[in-house]
Amino acid sequence: MSASLNRLERKLGHTFKNQDLMLLALTHRSFASRNNERLEFLGDAILNFVAGEALFERFPQAKEGQLSRLRARLVKGETLALLARGFDLGDHLRLGSGELKSGGFRRESILADALEALIGAIYLDAGLNTVRERVLGWLAGELDSLTLVDTNKDPKTRLQEFLQSRACELPRYEVVDIQGEPHCRTFFVECRVALLNDKTYGQGASRRIAEQVAAAAALVALGVENGND
């Protein structure tokens, strides 16, 4: 193995028994047909489990919706990309020439996906206890900074943070109708989310309120919240 990959292992805190798993986790789909997408899928599931378990133990009084919102903040793409940059992960990615020229090694989504793939690779290489220890070590600072106050954000913010944690495009809001006299109007807004087949809707005395209602409905439709939190 090259000296640069040995340095990466030291930064990750894990020495791979199966070096092929590490190389596969660093291989973007633009580089080869055998790439890190399956490992990313596995790593995403493991990350959500490990983060969820840690939050469950850390916040025994939190409701389901609060835990979901805390987890969305903890595992969002921005956080993962920041960790990846701390590991200099972009220097080790195997990218196709097009992605290299366009700066793919700096792109947040590619870095976050590669880190999730490495989580999947560490799980296959060493098991759940080891990957849990590594992930919790990486996220220790973020975990320590979380409080239940972080769950009091408005629905639009919570929806945006959830979608960012999944590297999805942001929701789009559109006023579809305004009814009533100028001094007593009711705004009707639709919210479009790429992960949902159907739009969600909200109404209120202002556009802002209607958008918040539509965002709350989207969170319920996505299964992130149950509407009673």
From Swiss-Prot:
The gene is rnc. The active site is at 44, 116. This is Ribonuclease 3. NCBIfam families: RNaseIII (TIGR02191). Residues 5-127 form the RNase III domain. PROSITE patterns: DS_RBD (PS50137), RNASE_3_1 (PS00517), RNASE_3_2 (PS50142). Residues 154-224 form the DRBM domain. It comes from Azotobacter vinelandii (strain DJ / ATCC BAA-1303). SUPFAM superfamilies: dsRNA-binding domain-like, RNase III domain-like.
